[in-house]
From Swiss-Prot:
GO terms for molecular function: cytokine activity; interleukin-18 receptor binding. Belongs to the IL-1 family. The lineage of its organism: Eukaryota, Metazoa, Chordata, Craniata, Vertebrata. Changing residue 12 to A: Strongly decreased processing by CASP4 or CASP5. Keywords: Cytokine, Cytoplasm, Inflammatory response, Secreted. This is Interleukin-18. Changing residue 168 to A: Reduces binding to IL18R1 and the ability to induce IFNG production. GO terms for biological process: angiogenesis; cell population proliferation; cell-cell signaling; cellular response to lipopolysaccharide; cholesterol homeostasis; cytokine-mediated signaling pathway; defense response to Gram-positive bacterium; establishment of skin barrier.
Amino acid sequence: MAAEPVEDNCINFVAMKFIDNTLYFIAEDDENLESDYFGKLESKLSVIRNLNDQVLFIDQGNRPLFEDMTDSDCRDNAPRTIFIISMYKDSQPRGMAVTISVKCEKISTLSCENKIISFKEMNPPDNIKDTKSDIIFFQRSVPGHDNKMQFESSSYEGYFLACEKERDLFKLILKKEDELGDRSIMFTVQNED
């Protein structure tokens, strides 16, 4: 049985141009080219825990903190413990692009603007016309750790969501990965729906 030929998936360039020391290629036919962006796909309701099994929740001050909770406490404190993880199509293969939101009175979306973790009062947008965003994180499984996830910032490469103890609180922060197997940047994500 003969193999079927595969249609070439190539771009014919007809010209080149230098603009500000950058070489640009001009395509003969660019109608099938896709611009860089994130496009919203679907959302899931999830509980996020650190490796000490503490549940991520939003306190009255809208701060993301981790706390010991039983499953019934977790249910009793919903919606502050249930996060909306919205998945996005990414024009570049870097992991599953996601936003993390919570709906208390209003929807707030996790941001790492200026490397500071906070919730912004906003719905996750349907499209983000860029390759980086302070609200997009790349959710990836951790090699060698069954069902453990990590979330890398799309704005700050090499920076991950992490759990850090500060006085008596366990806070969600953005942290540069400092060592292989850093457990502070690993989480479990339990889908509720």
